UniProtKB/Swiss-Prot annotation:
Protein name: Taste receptor type 2 member 38
Tissue occurrence: Expressed in tongue, stomach and duodenum.
Residues glycosylated per entry: N177
Function as written in the Swiss-Prot or TrEMBL entry: Putative taste receptor which may play a role in the perception of bitterness.
GO terms (BP aspect): detection of chemical stimulus involved in sensory perception of bitter taste
Record key words, sorted: G-protein coupled receptor, Glycoprotein, Membrane, Receptor, Sensory transduction, Taste, Transducer, Transmembrane, Transmembrane helix
Organism in which the protein naturally occurs: Rattus norvegicus
Any Gene Ontology CC annotation: plasma membrane
Family, per entry: Belongs to the G-protein coupled receptor T2R family.
Length: 331
C-alpha cells in the first residue's frame, strides 16, 4: 500500500512562494482570457458580427476567468486557513466543488467547438454526416445554448447535492461523539461529491474525443490525397486541420493534467495530509487555463492581428517619446 509522510504544515517561505506563483498564474490567466473577451466584446460594440467560433471562444474565456478566480481563492484558503490536521473546511470544499462545475462547463464548450471544427473542416462523403455537419453549422448557437443549459442543470444538481449532504453530515456530527467516525463520514462525503460532480463530464468528453478523432482521420486522408496530387506550397485545408488539431490536443492535454491534479489532490488532502503536494497540484491546475488561452491567441488570426496592432502602437509611442526627449537638446 502506498504511504506518504504527512506534511501537516509547510515553511513560511514555501507559503510565500506558493502564493506568489498563484498570483502570477492568476494575473497571466486573467490578462490572456480578458484579452479574448475584450476583443470580441469590442467587435460587438462596433456592431461587427461574431462568427460561431468567436462566440464559443468568448464563452470559454468567460468560464476561464471564473476558473482562475476560484483557483486563486483555493490557493489562499489552502495556504492561510486550511490546516492539514483539521477536517476540510466547508469553504475549501465549496471552492473545489465550484471549480469542478466550472471546469465541466468549459468541457462542454470545447466539445461544441470541436463539433464546429468538424463541420467546417472535414469533407464528408456520406449523406448522413453531410446533413449532420450542415445542421451543426446552421444550429450552432442553439446547440451552444443547450450545452450551457445542460451544464447549468448539472452544476445546480452538483451544488444542491453538496450543500444538502454537507448539512446532513453536520447534523449527524452534532449528535455523535465519535470524532474519528465523523471524520471518515466527512471524507466519504467529499469523495462522493467529487465523483457526482464529474459524472456530467462523461457526455462532453465522449463528444470531444469522437470529434477530435474524426479530425485526425480527416487530416490523415488529406495528407494521403496531397501526396497523390501536385499542390502548391500553401494549402488552406491543411492549415485549418492543423490549427484545429493543435487547439483540441492542447485543450485535451491541459484538461487531463488539470483533472488528474485535482484527482490526486483529494487523497493528498484527506488521507495523507500532504500540504506541499496539494500546493503543487493547485499550481498545476491554475497553469492550465492560462496556458491554453495563450495557445488560443497564438492560433487565432483576429487575436494575433490585434496584438500586432497593440505592439505597433506601443512602439510608435516609444519613438514619439524619444523624439520629444531629443528635440529640446537640439533646440
Amino acid at each position: 500500500m502506498l504511504t506518504l509522510t504527512p506534511v501537516l504544515t509547510v515553511s513560511y517561505e514555501a507559503k510565500i512562494s506558493f502564493l506568489f506563483l498563484s498570483v502570477v498564474e492568476f494575473a497571466v490567466g486573467i490578462m490572456a482570457n480578458a484579452f479574448i473577451v475584450l476583443v470580441n466584446f469590442w467587435d460587438m460594440v462596433k456592431k461587427q458580427p461574431l462568427n460561431n467560433c468567436d462566440i464559443a471562444l468568448l464563452c470559454l474565456s468567460i468560464t476561464r476567468l471564473f476558473l482562475q478566480g476560484l483557483l486563486l481563492l483555493d490557493a489562499i484558503q489552502l495556504a492561510c486557513f486550511q490546516q492539514m490536521k483539521d477536517p476540510l473546511s466547508h469553504n475549501y470544499q465549496a471552492i473545489l466543488t465550484l471549480w469542478m462545475s466550472a471546469n465541466q462547463v468549459s468541457l462542454w464548450l470545447a466539445a461544441c467547438l470541436s463539433l464546429l471544427y468538424c463541420a467546417k473542416i472535414v469533407r464528408f462523403s456520406h449523406t448522413f454526416p453531410l446533413h449532420l455537419a450542415s445542421w451543426v453549422s446552421r444550429r450552432f448557437l442553439q446547440m451552444l445554448l443547450v450545452a450551457l443549459l445542460f451544464s447549468g442543470v448539472c452544476t445546480a444538481l452538483c451544488l444542491w447535492d453538496f450543500f444538502s449532504r454537507s448539512h446532513t453530515v453536520v447534523t449527524s456530527m452534532l449528535h455523535m461523539n465519535n470524532t474519528e467516525f465523523n471524520l471518515q463520514i466527512e471524507k466519504l462525503n467529499f469523495f462522493y461529491s467529487f465523483v457526482f460532480c464529474n459524472v456530467g463530464s462523461v457526455p462532453p468528453s465522449l463528444v470531444f474525443l469522437i470529434s477530435s478523432g474524426v479530425l485526425v482521420i480527416s487530416l490523415g486522408n488529406h495528407m494521403r490525397t496531397m501526396k497523390s496530387q501536385t499542390r502548391g506550397s500553401r494549402d488552406p485545408s491543411l492549415e485549418a486541420h492543423v490549427r484545429a488539431i493543435i487547439f483540441l490536443v492542447s485543450f485535451l492535454c491541459f484538461y487531463v493534467v488539470s483533472f488528474c491534479a485535482a484527482l490526486i489532490s483529494i487523497p493528498l488532502l484527506v488521507l495523507w495530509h500532504n500540504k506541499g503536494g496539494v500546493m503543487v497540484c493547485i499550481g498545476m491546475m491554475a497553469a492550465c487555463p492560462s496556458g491554453h488561452a495563450a495557445i488560443l491567441i497564438s492560433g487565432n488570426a483576429k487575436l494575433k492581428k490585434v496584438i500586432v496592432t497593440i505592439l505597433f502602437w506601443f512602439q510608435s509611442r516609444q519613438k514619439v517619446r524619444r523624439v520629444h526627449k531629443v528635440l529640446p537638446r537640439i533646440l
